[in-house]
Amino acid sequence: MTLKVNLITGRTINQGANLENKTSPDYLEATAYCELNSNDIEKLDKSGNNVKVRTNYGEVTVKLKENNGNPDGIAFIPMGPWANAVVDHDTKGCGMPGFKGIQAELEGTSDKILLMKELIARYK
Amino acid sequence: MAVITDALCPFCGCMCDDLMIVTEGNRIIEAKHACKLGAAKIMGHHRIKEPMMRPDKNSNFKEVSYDEAIEAAAQILVKSKRPLLYGWASALCEVHKKGILLAEELGAIIDNTASVCHGPSTLAVHEKGLPTSTLGQIKNRADVVVFWGCNPAQAHPRHMGRYSVFAKGFFSDKGRKMRKIIVVDVRKTDTANVADEYVQVEQGADYMVISALRAILAGQAAVVPDQVGGVTKEQLVKLADTLKTAKFGAIFFGMGLTQSKGRYKNIDNAISLTTELNSFTKFVIMPMRGHYNVTGFGQVCTWETGFATAVDFARGAPYYNPGETASNDVLYRKEVDAAMIIAGDAAAHFPANSVRHLAAIPLVQIDPYWNPTTEIADVVIPTAICGVEVEGTAYRMDGVSLRYRKMIEPTHPTDIEVLERLIERVKEIRGD
């Protein structure tokens, strides 16, 4: 089933360590995932190891990971092109887009995760 | 083999100044004392070897000379009616100075990565000022440290060791043992795991929680409900007591405040809380700046233009109004018709709708590395790495300026050289 969550994005150490290595598989590994706690993972259908994240602003497929530091209903994706495929562009009059607090719907999927080049090619 | 001692790290706003760099020939073979982030940057990755151009964004790049790439970049910028010059945070202040000159010459908008980081903090400082200090004062004096919406364990790995949690100083010779560490966040991070107290706030409720703390400090605890933003009144009262009984307190804040509901108003409220805490004791507040020299851009831009970032030169004089002139404002509105991205990666760190417009307009990239911005660029000019191959000045997160030395010799022209040639060519084409 579809799980409704509040999505936040942010820094991680592996995302930072690959900041200048963005064409590498290490960068994809470090940023193309979504963390949920085990309760929320239980609620997701298990039609694959990946998760499709859908918001009013876009859709992206990333790997599903467990992090029990997240409270119920909070999903976290490290900052980067995969997270930014679904964040809110509205700057609320102060220049800053909505990188945190985005209403999102998640569902399990076996769809593949796009490579950085493939993801960015969607914008051309 | 040569060893450079007390070298500065060019990764995050901590600007650790105790690295030991071991070089062999013109190659760095070790970056001692650096954290995972700093070491990754200093040890380096695959570089863009030569300048590149392509006739359209779906064609393959072809390597060209620096002359050809700079000419093409100058033509793109001169033909543009509304150019955007964005990035700057991974570059030194000397580069920023040239960038602002180019922006003025072009009548462009110049904006830095604070736009998607601590830009809202700058807006809050306009309203309330900033009761702050140096990191050294915090290291030597602080006995209560609050991390609000930031996760230094992952984003500023040596901050806690050098300045805020474990560091031993003049009045803090017992280090971690004499400090009370409080983490306020929406999820239990690695930083929360080392804290004495973790306060879990509902996402987007920081403003309310700060307001409740201010009410309690003002002696108005009676008006505070049993629970505010997911935090019990009991925990809030205890927290307010810990804060006001500190000998020297420090609040560090991050994107958890600047990017959540309320944006700059969260910071505005946190600054007011800090100011009010000074009625009881000494308290300071500081943004956890990300890129090592994102603070430096704000400094240079302020002394050159009067404004910290998002400065629009279209009227012939600097104009500033984030919400109107910041990068994502002008990209989402499809207002700019060409862009130059330098020392920052807009295509990786901007929302999809902004990247879509960047992909639709002529785009020049100046950067040592191939990244998502390269994927949508028309002209790519690789440069030397500031702080590793180029010397110059940068500003730490607390506003202290420090001088970077070269670790090795550059194999590419510097950003300064490329910008000087670009400015010269732009002036020639315009007949100035």
Regions found by a protein language model. Give the residues of each.
Chain B
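N-terminal export/assembly segments and adjacent metallocofactor-ligating motifs
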Residues: M1-Q220, M255, E335, L422-D432
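Short, well-ordered beta-strand core segments
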Residues: P83, V145-V146, I181, Y198-Q200, ...
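A short, well-structured juxtamembrane/interface segment
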Residues: K62-L77, V231-T242, G323-V330
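Extended redox/cofactor-interaction regions of prokaryotic respiratory oxidoreductases
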Residues: A103-F166, G175, I271-E375, A384-E389, ...
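Active-site phosphate/pyrophosphate-binding segments
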Residues: M208-V209, Q220-Y320
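Short amphipathic alpha-helical segments
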Residues: K97-G99, R158-M160, V194-A195, Y264-K265, ...
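C-terminal functional extensions of proteins
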Residues: V379, C386-D432
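Active-site-proximal structural scaffolding
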Residues: V95, I138-K139, K174, T232, ...
